Structure formats: structure tokens, C-alpha cells
């Protein structure tokens, strides 16, 4: 049996192996949180999907002078948010591993706006809080047009990056 998946799938594979079933487990999760791996199957594809969304949202945010809170997957791990937030030039990245104060965040956004930055992108891992609630507070406290975008399951699909296609093609 070949099992491709995250923690739950690989735990199930382990149970099968304990019963004597021949099992091969491949780490496949967009969270990239399987111990002993550098990158899991699906992580790079998810990062590219999120980065594409950030770039599109920056276009609309800058054109309309908005704050956009983008929620990405990551209940326990903020790696997707960190990697894509850095690559996409997010003003703030909120992850479950690091506590934050939404009032302080609002003050920082107001300060940036007053200093001439007319838009902000905030990337939020879902485990760090509710994008809808955080967006509402930011909008109320800053007086800026604040929108929320939740990518949801679109992050879990997509074409593999070119590197993987060529690396694993049978020649």
C-alpha cells in the first residue's frame, strides 16, 4: 500500500504496517509539517497558489487604498503564511505560533498609512484568529476600507510547479 498524506494518513499507514501490511508512506501536506522532511508534496504548489493571490490582491488593494486581510491555511503551523507573506511583501504576517494584539496591529497600519503607505496586505494563518473578526476590528479602528479574503480549499489544488514536472517525468 502506498499512502500519500499528512499526519492522519501516515498514522493510519503506521497502523497498517503494525498489522504486517507492506506500506510506503509519502509526506503529502500543504502545511509542510511532517517531521524529518524538508518539503512535503503539495507545499510548493500551495505556496505558488497563495503567492499568486497575494499579488492579485496587492493590485486591487493599491488601486483602491485598502487593507486586505488574506486568510490562508495553517491551523497549527504558520509556515505557509510566513513563506508567502515574505515573498509577497505583506505588511504583517499573523501565525498561531506568535501572539499578537489586534489593537497594536491597527495602530501600526494607521501609522503606515499616515506615513504614505496607502494600502496594506496582512497574511493570516487560520489558526491565528478569525480573518473576518480581525478585519472588522482593523476597519473600525483605522477608518480604512478593509476587506477580507479567505482562500480556503483552493490552496489544496493546482498544477505542480514546473520543477517537479520535469524532475519526475519518466524519460
Where in this protein do the model-derived segments appear?
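Acidic/polar active-site rim loop that often engages polyanionic ligands
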Residues: 26-39, 62-63
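Short beta-strand elements at the ligand-binding edges of bilobed clamshell
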Residues: 36-47, 158-165
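Short gly/pro/ser/thr-enriched loop/turn and capping motifs at secondary-structure boundaries
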Residues: 29-34, 100-102, 153-156
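Anion-binding (especially nucleotide phosphate/pyrophosphate-binding) glycine-rich loop
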Residues: 1
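Catalytic, metal-anchored helix/loop core of enzyme active sites in primary metabolism
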Residues: 139, 144, 151-170
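Accessory alpha-helical/coil subdomains and C-terminal extensions
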Residues: 4-5, 13-15, 22, 43-145, ...
Amino acid at each position: 500500500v502506498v499512502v500519500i498524506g499528512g499526519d492522519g494518513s501516515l498514522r493510519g499507514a503506521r497502523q497498517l504496517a503494525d498489522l504486517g501490511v507492506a506500506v510506503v508512506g509519502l509526506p503529502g501536506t500543504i502545511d509542510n509539517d511532517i517531521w524529518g522532511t524538508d518539503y512535503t508534496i503539495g507545499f510548493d504548489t500551495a505556496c505558488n497558489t497563495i503567492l499568486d493571490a497575494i499579488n492579485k490582491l496587492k493590485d486591487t488593494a493599491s488601486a483602491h487604498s485598502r487593507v486586505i486581510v488574506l486568510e490562508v491555511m495553517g491551523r497549527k503551523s504558520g509556515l505557509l503564511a510566513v513563506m508567502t507573506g515574505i515573498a509577497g511583501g505583506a505588511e504583517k504576517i499573523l501565525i498561531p505560533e506568535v501572539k499578537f494584539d489586534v489593537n497594536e496591529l491597527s495602530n501600526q497600519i494607521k501609522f503606515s498609512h499616515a506615513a504614505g503607505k496607502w494600502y496594506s496586505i496582512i497574511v493570516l494563518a487560520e489558526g491565528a484568529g478569525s480573518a473576518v473578526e480581525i478585519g472588522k476590528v482593523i476597519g473600525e479602528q483605522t477608518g480604512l476600507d478593509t476587506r477580507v479574503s479567505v482562500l480556503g480549499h483552493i490552496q489544496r489544488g493546482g498544477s505542480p510547479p514546473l520543477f517537479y514536472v520535469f524532475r519526475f517525468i519518466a524519460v
